[in-house]
Regions:
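A solvent-exposed, acidic/Ser-Thr-rich amphipathic alpha-helical stretch
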Residues: 15, 25, 29-96
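N-terminal Rossmann-like FAD-binding beta1-loop-alpha1 element of flavoenzymes
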Residues: 175-210, 358-368
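Short, low-complexity N-terminal intrinsically disordered segments enriched in polar/charged residues
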Residues: 1-41, 170-182
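Glycine-rich active-site loop/strand segments that organize a redox cofactor
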Residues: 221-258, 381-448
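N-terminal Rossmann-like dinucleotide/flavin-binding domain of flavoprotein oxidoreductases
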Residues: 61-106, 226-296, 464-484
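Flavin (primarily FAD) cofactor-binding/catalytic cores of flavoenzymes
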Residues: 137, 205, 210-212, 254-352, ...
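A short, basic/flexible loop-to-alpha-helix module at the beginning of a structural domain
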Residues: 157-182, 335-347
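Short beta-strand edge/turn micro-motifs at domain boundaries
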Residues: 2, 103-173
């Protein structure tokens, strides 16, 4: 860092310290009018549990004022102070603005919170930055803090009783007794279940995870041979245990699977593998779930738990098998992409891959690499972006240096309109960077899409969990004609030898792979828990009225039932808040509540700060 850079950094720290003193004073005095005066006219406040007991976004001064008036007394914020152990205040460029990004801690009526701000930096008046974005989050419940850091166990008890059980004995017995009325039963031990299990464990919540696979990590280990994560390692750490600095930027699926298995062991999580969840009933009077599971020996256990968490796949639950004309008449194997392990057995064969999302492209490339003649059938337009640099730009903030836990608050702070405009900008940029590739695809008849509001692949992930491909080589194969392409509009019906097109011609195939995605998680819930529970829960994934994933990591319409899922980043970020919600319920801690809804925004994206790509 140069002398000039050092001087700027010192000035920013001083400017923020002075601003935080003013902010803390008016917040503790509950002087809403003075507090709102600190906000810019175009500003946002996002709250996670601290003031509202849920997820809310309020935009512009009138709505922010109403929300503060409704929540500030119940929250009783005080003790506003510089955040301990967080990244120092810094001046950065965001959304074409120079802003000061900084953190603060505060106390509430029920615990401790952490806030994050983006202050608009004005070179003409640097001492008086305007508050553009405010995030407030609940981090701990008073007296019920995590057992980490200075609160970690001493371990001395294991050296005092030489004749008694040692640590390994106690862990073995804990695993065996884990089904004896756990407070929380988690269905699924993938990244969502493990992250939440670790958070709950550190809060002293008795938790059992049941996993249908033979080993933790098999949900990744048993996927197709060539699979590698498409976002970088520094955005994918799990709680408490980051990946080693020596790991590759893009982690292979088997390496991740081994890490998840080790994570369960190192975090001392009680996991029953080879255990099939059969269903559960909720006793309304007792406020308890009665769950049935089949163990590896075929025996059926009944487990009583207060809370039930569905963590069996996020957006990737039950495979979607479309009703395609004549498919039952096809003589060859028909495989859903979730069951596709690799293309080596199809060398020299003619393969049809239906679907052009990420799985469809990866399966097609795998088959091609193993010597198959591959045709892809496109059912709908697809967003395509190169892995580097386009696909990684969304996660670029995680490569700037601050710890992932700090950057998670940056991520959580972004309000929907800013997110939308940022993604429109990134999509325009990546479209320009990928121009030659995209032109090559269009020349082959590939139908491209950037979403209804031109926000690109990551917004498609957030809205529907698919509809995009981050290119790692398959697009070049399509553009070069090495992988053939047909449109679903050409298809008439399957026949024993392959398919018949609408012009009456036939095409022969030896195998069909359905890369057709997954059913809504609500359907998996319907299968396991019944119609009534599924209807109370409602739609899963996609933005809800508060601009968070619908019914994920938050209260659902079914009492004591929760859902967890999504990317590794999602699981790390939101597992903290779901664990706090569950712990508060178990400890009878009443979090603040509000009937206020988030400020509504036009999600169609018809207006934007940038032009169309």
């Amino acid at each position: 860092m140069s002398v000039i850079d050092t001087e700027i950094a010192v000035d920013i720290v001083k400017i923020y310290a002075a601003w935080l003193e003013r902010f803390g004073d008016v917040l503790e005095r509950r002087a809403v009018g003075e507090l709102v005066d600190l906000f810019d006219d175009d500003s946002y406040w996002k709250d996670v549990l601290a003031f509202t007991g849920g997820y809310r976004t309020f935009g512009e001064k009138p709505d922010i004022a109403r929300a503060l008036e409704a929540t500030i007394d119940g929250t009783a914020p005080k003790g506003v102070r510089q955040a301990k152990g967080r990244t120092a205040p810094r001046l950065v460029r965001r959304s074409a603005k120079w802003v000061i990004e900084a953190y603060f801690d505060f106390d509430t009526s029920v615990g401790t919170g952490t806030g994050f701000v983006r202050l608009l930096h004005d070179e003409a008046d640097p001492a008086n930055p305007r508050l553009w974005i405010l995030l407030t989050t609940l981090q701990e419940l008073a007296g019920l803090e995590e057992g980490v850091g200075a609160r970690r166990p001493s371990g001395l008890e294991y050296s005092h009783s030489f004749a008694g059980d040692n640590w390994a004995d106690q862990r073995r017995k804990a695993q065996e007794r884990a089904g004896d009325h756990p407070e929380v039963l988690v269905v699924g031990a993938g990244q969502a279940g493990l992250a939440l299990g670790a958070r709950l464990s550190q809060l002293g919540v008795k938790t059992l995870l049941v996993e249908k696979n033979a080993a933790v990590g098999d949900n990744w280990r048993n996927r197709y041979h060539s699979l590698t994560l498409h976002n970088e390692v520094w955005s994918n750490h799990l709680p408490y245990l980051p990946f080693p600095d020596s790991w590759p930027a893009f982690v292979p699926k088997d390496k991740l699977a081994g890490w998840l298995e080790a994570y369960a062991e190192f975090m001392e999580l009680n996991v029953w593998t080879s255990t099939q969840f059969l269903g559960a009933d909720f006793d309304q009077a007792a406020k308890q779930w009665s769950a049935r599971v089949r163990r590896s020996d075929g025996s059926i256990d009944v487990i009583w738990a207060t809370h039930l968490v569905w963590a069996s796949g996020g957006t990737s639950g039950v495979p979607n098998i479309p009703n395609l004309p004549g498919l039952a008449d096809f003589d060859g194997p028909v495989i859903h992409s979730s069951s596709f392990l690799g293309g080596n057995e199809f060398s020299g064969k003619k393969a049809l891959v239906i679907g052009t999302g990420t799985s469809g492209h990866d399966v097609a490339q795998d088959l091609h690499s193993n010597g198959a003649a591959v045709t892809m059938m496109q059912r709908s337009p697809t967003c395509v972006v190169s892995l580097v640099p386009g696909g990684t730009l969304v996660y670029a903030v995680y490569s700037e240096g601050p710890p992932a836990d700090d950057v998670d608050l940056v991520t959580a702070a972004i309000p929907f309109p800013v997110l939308q405009n940022s993604y429109q900008y990134l999509t325009k940029k990546t479209t320009e960077l990928d121009r030659d590739l995209l032109d090559g695809l269009k020349a082959r008849g590939f139908k491209l899409d950037t979403g209804p509001d031109r926000t690109g692949f990551h917004m498609l992930y957030l809205r529907r969990g698919g509809g995009y491909y981050i290119n790692v080589g398959c697009s070049e194969l399509i553009a070069a004609g090495e992988i053939a392409l047909m449109q679903h509009d050409e298809f008439e019906t399957f026949v024993p030898s392959g398919l018949q097109t609408r012009d009456g011609s036939t095409r022969d195939f030896d195998v069909v792979v359905l890369a057709t995605g997954y059913r809504d998680q609500q359907e998996g819930i319907r299968d396991a828990l019944g119609e009534a529970v599924a209807e109370r829960v409602g739609t899963v994934w996609g933005f809800d009225d508060n601009y968070v994933m619908s019914n994920m990591w938050q209260r659902t319409g079914q009492e004591n039932f929760w859902l967890a899922g999504g990317s590794l980043l999602d699981c790390r970020l939101y597992s903290r808040f779901l664990a706090l919600l569950i712990k508060a319920d178990l400890a009878h801690v009443a979090l603040p509540e509000t009937e206020l809804a988030s400020t509504r925004y036009d999600s169609s994206g018809l207006t934007s700060i940038i032009g169309a790509p």
